Swiss-Prot record:
Residues 170-285 form the Fe2OG dioxygenase domain. Pfam families: 2OG-FeII_Oxy, DIOX_N. Signal peptide: none annotated. It comes from Pisum sativum. The lineage of its organism: Eukaryota, Viridiplantae, Streptophyta, Embryophyta, Tracheophyta. The active site is at R276. One of its GO terms (biological process) is gibberellin biosynthetic process. Keywords: Dioxygenase, Iron, Metal-binding, Oxidoreductase. Its EC number is 1.14.11.13. It catalyses: gibberellin A1 + 2-oxoglutarate + O2 = gibberellin A8 + succinate + CO2. Pathway: Plant hormone biosynthesis; gibberellin biosynthesis. Its cofactor is Fe cation. This is Gibberellin 2-beta-dioxygenase 2. The keyword Metal-binding applies.
Length: 345
């Protein structure tokens, strides 16, 4: 039986059909920057169309993902246990969180990809490595374009203030490919010998959480399941669109914008009849990068909300918690009145 973290169980929040913000990247730049900021403020999530990622780059990685996940369990395990990179099945993180999925997790570093390719695609490692690198380069460029638009919309003097973090050669960015088999197949020995107790569409594929990185660039096949939570606690189903990308604000960007952008909480429910495959590029800083609100974001009316921390420190804190726990609270600046109260004791 799959046991998600307590916070990743299906909650009683209402689910509502709401239009997801869609941003056409072919629009005039000043208009684009305003739309990006608005979407990040209101939802922490939006869809981009007319992007620059070539269709063939997407389709080639799709084919590799389908080929890998169609292998039997023993072949997939030969790709290496996810510690953290490699193949994983049901386990999400080190603290007991689980979901109805299997996945490949890769570091974006080309050398790391080359090494992993030898076990993931033994019969064509160079081809696999090239396909993954092409995809990462394309979505990284898309990420930087969006971050520069956000900086312009926030009137940050240096428009590269955010994108340069991702462009750094030591960036800790990741690529993850998730595969959610149909619920009815999860009891099949070719997938996993464990049996599930329910076969309805409320099974957790991936529990409720926010992403710790700066931005997540996501796309999937034509099978739904992804839901995002609004600031008011409503769950919004996200319609799949294999040719386009969805953008999620992560915890690190929430800090960099001093809370003006809020990381989006999301989850994935499994499908009873069709497999879902999704790809996420997690844009992250280098491990030693000091993360704190941009100076433009801190004013007398908007005091600093977070104390500085390195990306390595935040990762360590995140991995010490359960999937659905709120991580940023421990990095918030204490209110002045709290400090005064403590001194008076």
């Amino acid at each position: 039986m799959v046991v998600p973290s307590p916070t990743s169980m299906i909650r009683t929040k209402k689910t509502k059909a709401v239009g997801i913000p869609t941003i056409d990247l072919s629009l005039e730049r000043s208009q684009l920057s305003e739309l990006v900021v608005k979407a990040c403020e209101e939802y922490g999530f939006f869809k981009v169309v007319n992007h620059s990622v070539p269709k063939e780059v997407i389709s080639r990685l799709d084919e590799e993902g389908i080929e890998f996940f169609s292998k039997n369990s023993s072949e997939k395990r030969q790709a290496g246990t996810s510690t953290p990179f490699g193949y994983g099945c049901k386990n999400i993180g080190p603290n007991g969180d689980k979901g109805e999925l299997e996945y490949l997790l890769l570091h974006s570093n080309p050398i790391s990809i080359s090494e992993r390719s030898k076990t993931i695609a033994k019969d064509h490692p160079i081809k696999f490595s090239c396909i993954v690198n092409d995809y990462i380069k394309a979505v990284k460029d898309l990420t930087c374009e969006i971050l520069e638009l956000a900086a312009e919309g926030l009137w940050v003097p240096d428009k590269s203030s955010l994108s340069k973090i991702i462009k750094d050669e030591h960036s800790d960015s990741l690529l993850r490919i998730n595969h959610y088999p149909p619920v009815k197949k999860l009891g099949n020995d070719n997938w996993d010998p464990s049996k599930i107790q329910n076969s309805n569409n409320n099974n957790i594929g991936f529990g409720e959480h926010s992403d710790p990185q700066i931005l997540t660039i996501l796309r999937s096949n034509n099978v739904g399941g992804l839901q995002i939570s609004t600031h008011h606690g409503l769950w919004i189903p996200v319609p799949p669109d294999p040719s386009e990308f969805y953008v999620m604000v992560g915890d690190a960007l929430q800090v960099l914008t001093n809370g003006r952008f809020v990381s989006v909480r999301h989850r994935v429910l499994t499908n009873t009849t069709k497999p879902r495959m999704s790809m996420m590029y997690f844009a992250a800083p280098p491990l030693n990068w000091l993360i704190s609100p941009l100076s433009k974001m801190v004013t007398a009316h908007s005091p600093c909300l977070y104390r500085p921390f390195t990306w390595a420190q935040y990762k360590q804190a995140a991995y010490a918690l359960r999937l659905g726990d709120t991580r940023l609270d421990q990095f918030k600046v204490q209110k002045q009145e709290d400090s005064n109260d403590s001194h008076s004791l």
